[in-house]
Design a protein with these regions (language model features):
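Charge-rich, low-complexity amphipathic helices
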Residues: 32, 51, 88-92, 153-157, ...
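A sequence-composition feature that detects small, non-aromatic residues
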Residues: 7, 20-22, 70, 87, ...
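N-terminal short leaders/motifs
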Residues: 46-70, 154-155, 164-176, 189-198
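Core catalytic region of metal-dependent phosphoesterases/phosphodiesterases
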Residues: 3-6, 10, 15-110
């Protein structure tokens, strides 16, 4: 039986890359509905697709499921990230009942105002050392590939899914300090906009 929520936020799915967990997302979308659905960037991995075309049926099914939700009345907002930044060309346009925006604001049931943005525009590496971001992306893609095979072995042993890439990232002191600095910056920016909180993606946490 489906559960219904006021709002659901999804980010950093990276459809078009072999590391995308499309089947898990599809399962989630089947059994969870909402009045508002925010796609908070990096839904499609344009960087990966330009290197190698990868688009299995499960990735197509996710897109179709999202479009179906929009047709059935879910108010969907797509906020592009750095991996699907090509969509920023269409800001302000509604595509298949999905509104494309650079950022938006969500009012909670408790009347709290949340700032919703992907976050890459506030990432120093993305803005000033883009080449470094591409190198980091290649390393992360390899980690996701490793993660996939690692979890296949875990499934054979009847063990639950466990994110190796997330574990390693949180164990590296430098990565932790960068993540903490990013989170502090985003909270400060949200406050500057008169918001009670921020919902963002980008750092995969």
């Amino acid at each position: 039986k489906s559960k219904n929520y006021r709002a659901i936020w999804i980010s950093d799915i990276h459809l078009g890359s072999s590391g995308a967990q499309a089947e898990h997302l599809l399962e989630f979308l089947r059994y969870n509905d909402s009045n508002y659905l925010y796609l908070v960037g990096d839904i499609i991995d344009g960087w990966s697709l330009t290197k190698r075309w990868y688009w299995p049926q499960s990735h197509n099914d996710v897109i179709q499921k999202i479009l179906r939700k929009a047709r059935k009345g879910t108010k969907i907002t797509f906020i592009p990230g750095n991996h699907d930044e090509g969509a920023r060309t269409f800001l302000g346009i509604t595509f298949g009942d999905i509104e494309i925006k650079n950022e938006t604001f969500h009012k909670t049931a408790r009347n709290e105002k949340l700032w919703v943005i992907h976050g890459d525009l506030f990432d120093e590496v993305m803005q000033h050392a883009r080449w470094l971001a591409y190198i980091g992306d290649s390393a992360y893609t390899f980690l996701l590939w490793l993660n996939k095979w690692f979890n296949r072995i875990r499934r054979l042993m009847n063990l639950p899914y466990w994110s190796l890439s997330q574990f390693l990232k949180l164990k590296v002191k430098k990565a932790v300090s960068i993540i903490n600095a990013f989170e502090t910056l985003m909270v400060r920016e949200a406050s500057r906009r008169g918001c009670d909180g921020v919902v963002c993606g980008h750092i995969h946490k």
